[in-house]
Regions:
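Accessory, usually C-terminal, subdomains that scaffold auxiliary metal cofactors
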Residues: 185-213
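Electropositive, gly/pro-rich neighborhoods at or near active sites that engage anionic ligands
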Residues: 2-181
Length: 213
């Protein structure tokens, strides 16, 4: 059957990647604690990259954003940034996966098996990267005991601050939970839920109107 053939092909990808992993240099991805501590201490800008962003870099669309050469170029520019006040967060999935829950384990095992070469093409093996799972810890890890601590640290980033959330119209980030209950104030700039990058300049102009004093 087709499903059986796909399963065999996927297992072959994973087997081949076990060999590739021995050849490719190990990437340094810091822990969630190290990532959050660094952000809190340095008040830096943060960019998170995952499988969706890699698809867009590769000029392939995802569910809520069509591909474009301009978007691909801009994402490459960001992931390769050497700005001292900016960190790049990537999934900590290039070496070991045994600490992840079953579903994320299977997802990332196959994803990396198929895309390791593409990731390494845009990453610098001599650079220190930070952990993209700072906001996904509850989903990713088998051991959930640190999740509450991590979320409290995450909330320190915007604690007692006036914040602006730029989001899709239907995202409703933080509504119905206490994620932002420690902020001084919240403003929202609502964007199209699909293909928001097509309105990049309009969104940027709205963001520029916000008083940053």
């Amino acid at each position: 059957t087709i499903d059986y053939k796909i399963e065999v092909i996927n297992k072959l990808y994973i087997l081949i990647d076990k060999v590739k992993k021995l050849i490719y240099s190990k990437l340094e991805v810091l822990s969630i604690d190290e990532t959050l501590d660094y952000i809190i201490k340095n008040k830096c800008s943060v960019s998170r990259f995952g499988d969706g962003e890699l698809k867009l870099i590769d000029n392939n669309g995802i569910f809520f954003q069509e591909s474009s050469q301009e978007l691909s170029s801009r994402l490459k520019e960001v992931i390769k940034s050497e700005n001292n006040n900016h960190i790049v967060c990537i999934p900590d999935v290039f070496d070991r996966l045994d600490n992840y829950s079953e579903e994320p384990y299977k997802h990332w095992e196959l994803h990396i098996a198929k895309t390791r070469k593409k990731w390494y093409a845009v990453l610098n093996k001599n650079k220190k990267y930070y952990n993209a799972f700072i906001s996904r810890c509850y989903y990713a890890y088998k051991d959930k005991k640190n999740c509450e601590k991590w979320f409290e640290k995450l909330k320190e980033i915007w604690g007692n601050k006036d914040i602006v959330i730029i989001e899709g119209k239907k995202s409703r980030l933080g509504i119905g939970n206490d994620l932002f209950n420690n902020t001084k104030s919240i403003k929202r700039i609502l964007c199209p839920e699909k293909n928001a990058f097509n309105n990049y300049n309009k969104i940027l102009e709205e963001a520029k109107k916000i008083d940053k004093s």
